[in-house]
Amino acid sequence: MKRRNADCSKLRRPLKRNRITEGIYGSTFLYLKFLVVWALVLLADFVLEFRFEYLWPFWLFIRSVYDSFRYQGLAFSVFFVCVAFTSNIICLLFIPIQWLFFAASTYVWVQYVWHTERGVCLPTVSLWILFVYIEAAIRFKDLKNFHVDLCRPFAAHCIGYPVVTLGFGFKSYVSYKMRLRKQKEVQKENEFYMQLLQQALPPEQQMLQKQEKEAEEAAKGLPDMDSSILIHHNGGIPANKKLSTTLPEIEYREKGKEKDKDAKKHNLGINNNNILQPVDSKIQEIEYMENHINSKRLNNDLVGSTENLLKEDSCTASSKNYKNASGVVNSSPRSHSATNGSIPSSSSKNEKKQKCTSKSPSAHKDLMENCIPNNQLSKPDALVRLEQDIKKLKADLQASRQVEQELRSQISSLSSTERGIRSEMGQLRQENELLQNKLHNAVQMKQKDKQNISQLEKKLKAEQEARSFVEKQLMEEKKRKKLEEATAARAVAFAAASRGECTETLRNRIRELEAEGKKLTMDMKVKEDQIRELELKVQELRKYKENEKDTEVLMSALSAMQDKTQHLENSLSAETRIKLDLFSALGDAKRQLEIAQGQILQKDQEIKDLKQKIAEVMAVMPSITYSAAASPLSPVSPHYSSKFVETSPSGLDPNASVYQPLKK
């Protein structure tokens, strides 16, 4: 019998690192860094009166233009710049200033936090809420402290550039989906043609191809299981769990069906399903435990060793079926899995055991024993091995539960710290609101103080001007007094010096001065008279002005009356025209009435003539005799009766014997 030994490679388990605390501390420091950067940028914005966060999208735009020029050419880079410029102009023209600044700042900070390694989680969402609240509550209203005209183009770029990038991303996504759809269509066509080719082959070659495919899939599953083991050790969930567990089951079912068909064809009378029910139930229990513990074992190398057991185990099972039915219970699940042509599910338990015991040398021995082919193991040893695997799996389950409890305790501590942080955030928000109110009051007081200072400065300037004017007048008065005192002193000195010499000249001078004084008094009287006359003239002129005002009022009233009279004249002329039209219509009506009356008189005359003629005819009618008795008919009334004729005076004589017509 051909013997195949399987090589079991040593599994090197990496050291288990507790990354929970490391992740928590790293994330807290990361978000603290974000908050520090945000606070520094806001402080720089407030101090330098410029929105520095708007420079980040501009820098991204420059990098994207450089990359497009480097990898896609000049034409695409120029097209990208034109599209971005157009989008910026549209945002600059059609979005209001306050909403533009709010949307730009909010987008910049949200995008900055979005680019972290953490993605969407509770701290990022809380930071987003904080940014949006600060932008909407504080910075949305205070735009006076910034250079609006300088910041507005950058704000428009912060909105227009992401719109352009989203447009290009949507285009690439649509093209990617269309390409995937085309690939799927081509893949379906290829599979259809491949199935046609396989169905055209003989059944022996089809079986060979199936076995080759199964071997390839088993070989491919080996590195997948290695990666899943590493991920499981690092605390992740294996992504290829379903694939690796379902492959042995699929092979088991397919080969079991083929085995049943062969048994029916050869009429062996062996029912493997009824014989191996206890073993199957135990295997299903083990597989259930494996699926819940997420443990696997690398045993794809044992496929070759199980192929040699197919004939022996089938023969022993058939002989025991004929001899003793109790021997089936003692058969190992490894022989059952070998007869059905599938890999035993206990191999995944051995894999888990190999993982858990790789730290000790005894674990290495167990691993080497597990790699021995199945045909060298005895039946009790297999059951013992399975029980040991179950115990170890239970120990692993307890360890995982302990880890779960530790994680839950850490989650509870984190939730308590989160609550404390939320309470601190609420207190900080209240303090922030109080500080905002204080700042608002301080700004209002500052504005009031500025207004008061400007008013006081104006008053001070007016008082300084008045003071300078009064000082000038005072200086002039002082100068004039000094001049008068100097002239008086000179006059006194001159008089004292020449008192004895020129008395006569002084007397003459006094006389002349007295005469001049009299003349001046006369002139003063004349001037006063002239002033009185002028005052009288002024009064007369004032009266004349008042009269002129009255005349103006009268003229305005007169013009109004003239307008009214003109309007009345126009209305009167219109009324006269209407009256003339009415009179002319009345004359026409009278004429028509007279004509109608004349016609009526003519008709009356004609009626009278007709009546006379009728009377003459009636007068002639009695001379005509009719034979009334000869006819049995009733008497006929005459066509003309005197009853219908009105009694009117006629010129005919009814007593005349012979009718004599009137001569015309």
UniProtKB/Swiss-Prot annotation:
GO terms for cellular component: nuclear membrane; rough endoplasmic reticulum membrane. The keyword Hydrolase does not apply. The chain crosses the membrane at residues 28-48, 75-95, 120-140, 154-174. The keyword Iron-sulfur does not apply. Signal peptide: none annotated. Residues 253-274, 320-367, 631-664 are annotated as: Disordered. Pfam families: Macoilin (PF09726). Glycans are attached at N324, N340, N452, N655. Keywords: Endoplasmic reticulum, Glycoprotein, Membrane, Nucleus, Phosphoprotein, Transmembrane, Transmembrane helix. The modification Phosphoserine is found at S305, S332, S631, S634. It is a multi-pass membrane protein. It is found in: Rough endoplasmic reticulum membrane; Nucleus membrane. InterPro entries: Macoilin. GO terms for biological process: neuronal signal transduction. Residues 320-348 have a biased composition (Polar residues). Residues 253-265 have a biased composition (Basic and acidic residues). Plays a role in the regulation of neuronal activity. Belongs to the macoilin family. This is Macoilin. It comes from Bos taurus (Bovine).
